[in-house]
Amino acid sequence: MTEISMLNDVQKIIVLDYGSQYNQLIARRIREFGVFSELKSHNITAQELRDINPIGIVLSGGPNSVYADDAFGIDPEIFELGIPILGICYGMQLITHTLGGKVVPAGQAGHREYGQSSLRLRSASALFAGTPDEQLVLMSHGDAVTEIPEGFHLVGDSNDCPYAAMENTKKRLYGIQFHPEVRHSVYGNDILKNFAISICGARGDWSMDNFIDMEIAKIRKTVGDRKVLLGLSGGVDSSVVGVLLQKAIGDQLTCIFVDHGLLRKNEGDQVMEMLGGRFGLNIIRVDASKRFLDLLAGVEDPEKKRKIIGNEFVYVFDDEASKLEGVDFLAQGTLYTDIIESGTETAQTIKSHHNVGGLPEDMQFELIEPLNTLFKDEVRALGTALGMPDEVVWRQPFPGPGLAIRIMGEITAEKLETVRESDAILREEIAKAGLDRDVWQYFTVNTGVRSVGVMGDGRTYDYTIAIRAITSIDGMTADFAQLPWEVLKKISVRIVNEVDHVNRIVYDITSKPPATVEWE
């Protein structure tokens, strides 16, 4: 076994996954305190946790009821390990139910709570040190604890929740009914930090330098003297993977840059110049644009697009790998956010990702995914720690399927050109305005909608381009960027004047959720 958590000299807090779509945020928040944290299945045993040797355990929230026939449980011996445990929402209910307390099912006694609620602290607790006696928290539960297990005492309540926080300090067990990992819990970060630092005794000394050392050791142990093939997409993720792999295994790495005809303007030449020339990666450039575009002709469904691109991407790799000797591994830039949006054992699929579930079952490679425990902002920090320049590290995120998922409906050469050119204008103007670090991600979309316009003295019937610009910290949630009107106006004027077959620009003002970042 070669997981990071096997490296016993690194303190870590393990988050057990009970299905909340935001459970990765718990690990993300803990990492902000300089403590390594990762998710594990709720099926993990007490002995497996002993082997990992964490300094703390968090039981995440989840959509289930502890009374459901298929409810996710826990190995009860975990509570006897002597390791501090924090149960969040479902996690608190699971502690209560397992240790002999009482949880009331949804619909009884009006215990449902959704949205911000006022938490009132009733007794002092190390978990809430430095926070006010009354504070806003995000509640999202139907079931509720009405009797706490023996040895526990009440810490806090709310108007509709008689036990919103409880603890057993002797056994170092803590439960909170709200979600501290989301920003709507005003002092949530303080609570998680108290758990990690004060209760678990974390040193707070984990950093990207630690990650580099751990991941290099993991890669070398996994790969040995075998060879790795990496697909470069031109985005930040695959570029960082390439530099990390080269640092770990040197010339055992061969990179294939597949030009599928769906790249941004001048992307291919920039990738070769930067990663091939400046960083010395061994890159094979493959022009497979006709191959991809022929397969995508007439395809409108976004999931079919993703699957076609994911499958064909690996088949191109097969073709190129057959020309090489002894290639056993395919490396990908899969992130934590890719994994959760593609669905896990405990969470439903939001959409498939080209890096997760979009690969053919008969693929001849083993997978290496060095970034699959990181969020996007952490990948940028990793790139900086690896010595990569800002123009690479802060490059706009770009999905593996490329512009295919920024074109609604069928992909045509005309639509591709509208997105490619409008996106270049958008990126240029955002940079000129000095907003390229403030806006987390920005791109254009061909909506597939045509509308009537007037240009010169003639009537037009051309495409509508949508601008998507968001602010975010980790990609799990996002708000639309409130760009200055003068910047939006300049972008709009330039696009309709400089890009053929476009006569209307709209601005996407939807947050995530309910929308995802990409349109498809």
Swiss-Prot record:
Pathway: Purine metabolism; GMP biosynthesis; GMP from XMP (L-Gln route): step 1/1
Keyword ATP-binding appears in the UniProt entry: yes
Record's GO cellular component terms: cytosol
Active site residues of this protein: 89 (nucleophile), 179, 181
Catalytic activity: XMP + L-glutamine + ATP + H2O = GMP + L-glutamate + AMP + diphosphate + 2 H(+)
Binding-site positions, ATP: 233-239
Class of enzymatic activity (EC top level): ligase
Pfam family, one: NAD_synthase
Signal peptide: none
Keyword Nucleotide-binding among UniProt keywords: yes
EC number: 6.3.5.2
SUPFAM superfamilies linked: Adenine nucleotide alpha hydrolases-like, Class I glutamine amidotransferase-like, GMP synthetase C-terminal dimerisation domain
Gene3D superfamilies: 3.30.300.10, 3.40.50.880, HUPs (3.40.50.620)
Residue ranges of domain GMPS ATP-PPase in the record: 206-395
Residue ranges of domain Glutamine amidotransferase type-1 in the record: 12-205
NCBIfam families in the record: guaA_Cterm, guaA_Nterm, PRK00074.1
Functional description taken from the UniProt entry: Catalyzes the synthesis of GMP from XMP.
Record text on subunit structure and interactions: Homodimer.
Protein name: GMP synthase [glutamine-hydrolyzing]
